[in-house]
Amino acid sequence: MKVLTWNILAAEWVKKSYYPGVDTSVIFDNKARFARIGKILKQIDADIIMLQEVMPQEYLNLVLLFGDKYFISELKTMVWGYNKNSESGNVTFLKRSLFPKNTISHYPREYGVYTRCLYKNKPCDIFNVHLDDQSPQKRYKQWDDLHAISRKKDCNNIIAGDFNQEYKKKCKLYNTPGFETHNMCPTYYIERKMNIDNILTKGFQKAPLSKCNWYPTRIEDGFKEYGSDHLPVIVEVDIHE
């Protein structure tokens, strides 16, 4: 089962001051950015897709592009402390050929989308998260909440998304007992190299680490290649038969 998570960069967060020296025709061309993102998603053809920073119009376009192949959650708009009127949010896709529709339930949470489903007749909890970007204490509180509501017994777990916390082996977010952290590669290329997006799993067979994507050294090249300031993270996992 191929799992992908990606912060695709909402247009509402794109400002010239955030990307100094970059041609504005590149960063503000939302149509071209979305076309590039859609092409990458089709090429990867993941079984589970978890996106962050999806704008309402992009959500409608994604449903048109992928609705025949995936069950798609509603858009969970995120509310940030410094912007109560944000429009973008998280969306989770489950491939129709692998997940029975009548077993899928989506629950909006402050930090994203919580999904319950069956995969190969076994229960699976999937968290598509975009953790707080201002307060480590709030991130840990959100982390504690998702673990409090997840099913513990005989349930496989996937936690993926934008953690807004740089990867460190001993960090609580990446060092949860029983969970395997799959990404060791940089996922954000503005200002400096950072690994802040990841996929964690529990209950699955041990899987190889996520392969590193091409990392841009120029912001403009990154926008042209990915359409976002984040890189996608992909891992392949399977359950114990």
Predicted regions and their residues:
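Structured beta-strand-rich core segments of catalytic domains in phosphoester-bond hydrolases
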Residues: I48-F127, L131, S210-P216
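Metal-dependent phosphoester-hydrolase catalytic domains
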Residues: R116-L118, Q137, K141, A148-I158, ...
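Active-site metal-binding loops of divalent metal-dependent hydrolases
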Residues: I8, V54, V129-L131, D162-F163, ...
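N-terminal, active-site-proximal structural segment of metallo-dependent hydrolase catalytic domains
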Residues: M1-L65, I239-E241
